[in-house]
């Protein structure tokens, strides 16, 4: 599942995804971002004055979804909590990986995205339904189960 996620985030040279955070009023906020897979983890450089940085400082919960694929309908999603990274050696490794893709950043804050769950939807050739889902962790906690129908 991890390799499928990597391939979907890195469809082009730089990682691309949509980051969902929680605004101060509790509503959702969605941002395009450039995730970095490096140093055994998933990271984001975020501008210090960005609304998404403010959201993550206040409430670290996030969801991250890959950009749509031009050739297939496969999807990859992760969720968890973001934590600021102040370790200079970790930042150097992640920065080198990020800039090797041609991307650039300066004094942006580095966040590690600590994963609590992931979902990969694998589709057959277009048009096909339903996809084959792979989840991590495989068995959700009872209070986190996703309902597939709308309750009356």
PLM segments and residue spans:
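Extreme N-terminal tail/first-helix region
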Residues: 1-16, 138-152
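Short amphipathic alpha-helical segments and helix-helix/interface helices
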Residues: 6-7, 53, 95
């Amino acid at each position: 599942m991890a390799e499928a996620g990597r391939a979907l985030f890195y469809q082009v040279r730089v990682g691309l995804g949509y980051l969902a955070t929680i605004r101060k009023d509790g509503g959702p906020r969605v941002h395009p971002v450039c995730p970095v897979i490096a140093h055994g983890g998933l990271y984001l450089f975020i501008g210090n004055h960005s609304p998404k940085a403010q959201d993550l400082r206040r409430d670290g919960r996030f969801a991250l979804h890959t950009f749509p694929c031009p050739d297939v309908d496969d999807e990859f999603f992760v969720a968890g909590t973001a934590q600021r990274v102040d370790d200079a050696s970790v930042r150097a490794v992640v920065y080198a990986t990020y800039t090797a893709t041609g991307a650039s950043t300066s004094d942006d804050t580095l966040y590690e995205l600590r994963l609590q769950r992931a979902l990969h939807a694998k589709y057959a050739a277009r048009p096909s339904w339903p996809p084959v889902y792979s989840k991590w962790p495989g068995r959700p906690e009872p209070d986190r189960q996703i309902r597939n129908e709308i309750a009356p």
